[in-house]
């Protein structure tokens, strides 16, 4: 059944010159390395005739070759593994097409001698063998074609899959059909964006402008139809949601866009997804929504990803709020951002923290700072304010070092290693800034005089 694909693999493989270290395939090809591995499946010097053990060993060799990116060797093993399609074990025989597709497509994608024609041939044969996997294979085949810039071929592939049916339609089959339709919608969205770009270069009075506008409207209707069913199904559908919302906004359907994004972010049937809240926030921001609404959206994002880049915007919104609860949360947000190693050189975060610490301490909210510092007192000094970091930060970015030095001085006192190191640096341009920092630390530090860290 798979002899044609076997021939394709044979073409890809290159035999070794030494026939003694090879195994002859049914197609007459010598397979290097295979002989010694087959010999490993022996008992008392005799080859096991057990079909399952042979194919199991072959599968292990394929997986090992894939992990090592040995595509040619994997192709050779794959040629032998095709016999699993004739396995006497019903379960294994039924599972074989999906395994062969996954392994074979991986090999053909990366093999240096593979090409689009070979991949297409393999995909088409696998669709007919593994009918239960038809939709999955069709979708992955389309993605492969997209990767190679073959948009029309990918679209035809998806259109064919869209109308395919096998037996009674199951719920899993319905989701796959929706996914196929949604990817078709993405292709239509791509065409729509190109038309939009062309439209932006035309004069509104131009005849071509009206024609392209009509084409775009038609394209957007098709896209909406194809994407709608999928985004109502619980799941993570970021690229589809973004595309759909962009078109809704372009045609002035703000209510439709808002409803879509709100459902995507808050519907409990959908999995937790930080991007859903990001998209909603960005939309509301474009709409110039009230600060309270923006804060409510970012508050949930903060709970999911406290180190998200939008947390600095969240802090700014909280800082400008009139409620003490928000202002206090604004301090927590900054500390939590800087709890993450990936943010320890974020100069904006350190600037915000330095400025906000001063503002809070002037406003007599000493206890807010103490509360945040209590849980960090034992690990932040080594994490942020060691002698090593003082030297490293000063060498890399003097502005960052100065901001951190002020924060270190406020939290740990003027005896802090980081603060003392920066204070001793002889830098003509920053001399006045360091002098002012010294005075500020003396004024605002939360550490009792005489305490050194």
From Swiss-Prot:
It is found in: Nucleus, Nucleolus. GO terms for molecular function: DNA binding. The keyword DNA-binding applies. It comes from the Eukaryota. Keywords: DNA-binding, Nucleus, Transcription, Transcription regulation. One of its GO terms (biological process) is transcription by RNA polymerase I. One of its GO terms (cellular component) is nucleoplasm. The keyword Nucleus applies. Its main location: nucleus. Signal peptide: none annotated. Component of the transcription factor SL1/TIF-IB complex, composed of TBP and at least TAF1A, TAF1B, TAF1C and TAF1D. In the complex interacts directly with TBP, TAF1A and TAF1B. Interaction of the SL1/TIF-IB subunits with TBP excludes interaction of TBP with the transcription factor IID (TFIID) subunits. Interacts with UBFT. Interacts with CEBPA (isoform 1 and isoform 4). Part of Pol I pre-initiation complex (PIC), in which Pol I core assembles with RRN3 and promoter-bound UTBF and SL1/TIF-IB complex. Component of the transcription factor SL1/TIF-IB complex, which is involved in the assembly of the PIC (pre-initiation complex) during RNA polymerase I-dependent transcription. The rate of PIC formation probably is primarily dependent on the rate of association of SL1/TIF-IB with the rDNA promoter. SL1/TIF-IB is involved in stabilization of nucleolar transcription factor 1/UBTF on rDNA. Formation of SL1/TIF-IB excludes the association of TBP with TFIID subunits. This is TATA box-binding protein-associated factor RNA polymerase I subunit A. It comes from Mus musculus (Mouse). The lineage of its organism: Eukaryota, Metazoa, Chordata, Craniata, Vertebrata.
């Amino acid at each position: 059944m798979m002899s044609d694909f076997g021939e394709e693999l044979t073409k890809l493989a290159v035999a070794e010159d030494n026939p003694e270290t090879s195994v002859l395939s049914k197609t007459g090809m010598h397979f290097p390395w295979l002989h010694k591995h087959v010999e490993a499946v022996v008992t008392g010097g005799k080859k096991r005739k057990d079909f399952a053990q042979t194919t199991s060993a072959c599968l292990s060799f394929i997986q090992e070759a894939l992990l090592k990116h040995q595509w040619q060797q994997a192709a050779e093993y794959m040629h032998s593994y095709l016999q699993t399609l004739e396995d006497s074990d019903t379960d294994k025989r039924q599972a074989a097409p999906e395994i062969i597709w996954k392994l074979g497509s991986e090999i053909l994608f990366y093999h240096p001698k593979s090409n689009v024609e070979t991949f297409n041939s393999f995909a088409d044969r696998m669709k007919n063998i593994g009918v239960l996997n038809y939709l999955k294979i069709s979708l992955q085949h389309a993605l492969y074609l997209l990767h190679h810039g073959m948009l029309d071929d990918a679209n035809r592939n998806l259109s064919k899959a869209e109308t395919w049916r096998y037996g009674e339609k199951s719920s899993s089959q319905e989701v796959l059909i929706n996914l196929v339709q949604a990817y078709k919608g993405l292709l239509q969205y791509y065409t729509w964006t190109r038309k939009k770009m062309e439209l932006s270069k035309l004069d509104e009075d131009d005849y071509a402008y009206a024609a392209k506008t009509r084409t775009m409207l038609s394209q957007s209707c098709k896209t909406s139809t194809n994407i709608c069913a999928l985004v109502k199904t619980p799941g993570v559908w970021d690229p589809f949601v973004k595309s759909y919302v962009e078109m809704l906004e372009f045609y002035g359907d703000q209510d439709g866009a808002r409803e879509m994004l709100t459902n995507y972010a808050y519907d409990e049937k959908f999995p937790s997804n930080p991007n859903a809240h990001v998209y909603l926030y960005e939309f509301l921001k474009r709409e110039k929504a009230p600060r309270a609404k923006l804060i409510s959206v970012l508050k949930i994002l903060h709970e999911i990803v406290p180190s998200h880049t939008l947390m600095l915007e969240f802090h700014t919104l909280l800082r400008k709020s009139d409620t003490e609860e928000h202002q206090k949360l604004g301090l927590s947000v900054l500390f939590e951002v800087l709890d993450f190693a990936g943010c320890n050189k974020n100069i904006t975060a350190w600037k915000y923290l330095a400025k906000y610490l001063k503002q809070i301490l002037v406003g007599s909210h000493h206890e807010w700072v103490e509360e945040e510092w209590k849980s960090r007192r034992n690990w932040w000094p080594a994490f942020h304010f060691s002698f090593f970091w003082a030297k490293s930060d000063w060498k890399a970015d003097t502005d960052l070092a100065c901001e951190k030095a002020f924060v270190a001085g406020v939290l740990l006192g003027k005896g802090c290693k980081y603060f003392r190191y920066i204070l001793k640096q002889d830098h003509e341009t920053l001399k006045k800034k360091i002098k002012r920092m010294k005075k500020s630390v003396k004024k605002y530090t939360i550490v009792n005089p005489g305490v050194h860290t």
